[in-house]
Amino acid sequence: MSQYCAADPIQRMVSRKGPYLDTQQQRVYKHRSGTGHGTNIRQPTTGIVEATFLQNNSGMNAVHPTTLNVQTHNAHATGRTIAKSVDTNSWVNDFSSMKVQDPLEFADSYKNLYKQYEQKQFHNTVPAQCPRNLYIPTVTRPQTTLNIVDHHEDKSSAVDQLIDDEFEKIEEEVKDQNQKLEFQESAQSFIEICERSQMKEKLQRSKFFQVMQKVSDGEATIRQDGENYVIR
């Protein structure tokens, strides 16, 4: 049977060849398997234990300085954090104990008087029988409304008077036009009568006939000025 197929693992380790398997380890195997003597095994076993202890001790010494340095660094950082926290707390306490004096601030007596004034105004405004949320203040009509209405009425009266005056002027102009047409028609009738008369030549030489001729042609007009008539 091959050495790799052996049932006992210790036997496989002993059968391997290498720098780490010496005669002492073989003797340990013999001791465990019952083929060796107890007096020969005790001393090598002690050597293996001492070597293992020394190896572990050297490993601990290699790791211990780094661990110590990390712990020391953490201790310093913790100390700085605690000191910073203490400084912050002291700053907060100092800030909270500060008293600011504003020279523009009102005096306490003035504040109390103003508070009493506000309470008095509140009690005078809100009725005692009605809740505050149901109070509806009465709205008084301003006096300026009447003045605006009066001013509007005066302005309307002035506009009406102006319109009346314009209508009177138009009526006068229409009346003058009617009179002008009436006088013109009368002048035309007078001219026609004079032309049919036997005294036509004599009437045509008169100034009145010449005026009537101008009125009939529209070159002149007759306007009534009171009781008199004016030819223009």
UniProtKB/Swiss-Prot annotation:
It comes from Candida glabrata (strain ATCC 2001 / BCRC 20586 / JCM 3761 / NBRC 0622 / NRRL Y-65 / CBS 138) (Yeast). Coiled coil: none annotated. Interacts with PEX7. One of its GO terms (cellular component) is cytosol. This is Peroxisomal protein PEX21. Keywords: Cytoplasm, Peroxisome, Protein transport, Thioester bond, Transport, Ubl conjugation. Its main location: cytoplasm. One of its GO terms (biological process) is protein transport. It is found in: Cytoplasm, Cytosol; Peroxisome. Mediates peroxisomal import of proteins containing a C-terminal PTS2-type peroxisomal targeting signal via its interaction with PEX7. Interaction with PEX7 only takes place when PEX7 is associated with cargo proteins containing a PTS2 peroxisomal targeting signal. PEX7 along with PTS2-containing cargo proteins are then translocated through the PEX13-PEX14 docking complex together with PEX21. Monoubiquitinated at Cys-5; acts as a signal for PEX21 extraction and is required for proper export from peroxisomes and recycling. InterPro entries: PEX18_PEX21_C. Pfam families: PEX18_PEX21_C (PF25098). Belongs to the peroxin-21 family. There is a cross-link at C5 (Glycyl cysteine thioester (Cys-Gly) (interchain with G-Cter in ubiquitin)).
